[in-house]
Amino acid sequence: MLVKFKISNFLSFNQEQTFSMISGKVRSKQDHLISYKKQKILKFAAIFGANASGKSNLVKAMDFAAVTILRGLPINIMDNYCRTSELNRDKPTKFEFEIKIDDRYYQYGFSLLLYKGQILEEWLYDVTTPSTKTIFERTVSDEPIVLSKQFSGEARKTLKIYAEGMQSNESLLYLTEMNRNKKDLYTKYPVLKPLRDVYRWFRGKFVVNYPEDPMSPAYFVD
């Protein structure tokens, strides 16, 4: 389930903006909410606004992020930064999702320079409890990947090997790489399950539809 989505420096979005499915303080319509621990999440939401106010661009931002996660950076993206200021050309664009999978909450995101088609950073956290737990943090440079302390032994060594093999790859996300023909990896090391679960959520649960797209009954099947 999508809980939050944050976007900055993309199309009409300049400063960071947040789309949140967390309920406000209104106590009516409790049947429209999903309760988990102390949090109440909306089952559905609608976005209202004038023409050219950014509604479609929010959907495009979600779609762009999902495509990048599942397939790699799209082509012809150099002008997709927010062009209200020419300075934005050299500023990072940031996408971040907070999602709920079973009884866990994850925060996954990445930043990139659209003008150069260059991924800069990537991160995945477990935010189920108030104490955020790092699963991994990646900076596309010479810096080594930061991994959770729960990964040890051969599992940790394997993660580092894959990270080192793509450390300078500026067009591919680590989460994507860790889900390319690696089914046996998660059977051998179940502790790595969060990397598989988050990717599978984007592949199987996160569906972006545009107004002109035909609606399939399959979209309504959980």
For every predicted segment, state its role.
Residues 7, 97-103, 124-126:
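Short acidic, glycine-rich loop/turn motifs
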